[in-house]
Amino acid sequence: MVKMKAARWYGAKDVRIEEVDVPEVKPHQVKIAVKFTGICGTDLHEYLDGPIFIPTETEHIYSGQKVPVTLGHEFAGEIVEVGSAVTRVKVGDRVTVEPILAKHNLVGDYNLDPI
């Protein structure tokens, strides 16, 4: 399995740079070679005082993840692989990402999904 480095959140003031497996691309997903990423306010608050939104005991309702989680959810890069069901973007496209894992977000209704 191919590896990548990731900033992994384990708890308040406990972020570790680790080698993790590069995830396999599922049919409705793309793989992005990240060129730039930042630390947003949510990352900072999770680092200083978390857990706030990061699930520690049970899996997140949409992502299925729990601690440890990889930080850096706002980024820019280039698509390097597309899943079999992806039709709107292609390898080589440059993209920016603010992933919000919520059903209502798909239609722009950020305020209707549970935290």
Regions found by a protein language model. Give the residues of each.
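Short structural boundary motif marking the start of a folded domain
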Residues: 2-7
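Residue-level signal for short segments within beta-strands and strand-turn junctions
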Residues: 8-10, 48
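Short N-terminal binding/cap micro-motifs at the start of the first secondary-structure element
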Residues: 13-17, 41-42
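Generic structural detector for well-ordered beta-strands
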Residues: 19-21
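Glycine-rich beta-strand-centered segment in the early N-terminal region that forms part
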Residues: 23-37, 52-110
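Disulfide-bonded cysteines in secreted/extracellular proteins and peptides
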Residues: 40, 113-115
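Short Gly/aromatic-enriched secondary-structure transition segments
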Residues: 45-53
